[in-house]
Amino acid sequence: EPLSIHLLADVDAYEQIVENAIGNKSPDKEEIFRFKWHGLFFLTPMKEAFMSRLRIPGGVLKSYQLRELAHIAQQITSGYVQVTTRANLQMRLIRPKDAPEFLHRIQAIGLHTRGSGADNIRNLTMNPTAGVDPVELIDVQPFVQQIAQVIINDRSFYDLPRKFNIAYDGGGLIGSVEDTNDIGVKAVKVGDEILFRIALGGATGHK
C-alpha cells in the first residue's frame, strides 16, 4: 500500500532541517512536529534549541561510540548526556544551526535518531546482562539488533496510531520487564527445547 504524502513529508524533513540551519532558524509549528521523526524535539519556550533522542538498540554501545558522543556533547550540545528508561540517550541544547552536523556525526558512528519520537516503534530493550548472564537461556542481542535495523529502514513502521514498545528477555537473572511492552518476547524452556513466549498488549504509564 502506498505511503501517505503526510508520512513521506515527515520522514523526509531532513532537507528542511538543513535549510533552517543556514540562518539558525527555529522551526515553525508544523516543522516542530515533523522534526520529531528525526529524533529532534524543539525545547521552546524554555530554550531555542533541540533535544535529540538517540536509538540505542538493547542499550548496547561500543567504546568508540561513547567517546564520540562525549565529544559531540562537549562541542555542540549542553555538555552532558541523559539516559532514558528505554536505554536511549538524550542530548540537549542543540542549536538549529548545529542540527545537521549533529545528525551527521551520530550516523557516522553507526547510531540513529530516526523514529525515536512521535508515533513510531521506540527503542528496543532487553535484559541488561544479555550475552554475559551465566544462566540465561539464550543471548537475545542478535535478535534485537536485527529487528532494530528492519524497523529503522522500513517506512511502514512509522506513523503508527500510537508509540509502540518491544522488549526481549533471554531468561537470565535480570529481566527486561517485557510484559509491560506492546510486544514482549521472553525465552522459556519447555522440556529440552528453548522457545520464545510472546506476550501482547502490555503497557506502562498512561492508559
Regions found by a protein language model. Name each.
Residues 8, 16-29, 44, 49-195:
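Small-residue-enriched alpha-helical segments and adjacent helix-cap loops
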Residues 32-33:
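Short, compositionally biased "basic patch" segments
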Residues 1-9:
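Intrinsically disordered, low-structural-confidence terminal and linker regions
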Residues 204-207:
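Internal alpha/beta scaffold segment
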Residues 198-202:
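FAD-binding subdomain of flavoenzyme oxidoreductases
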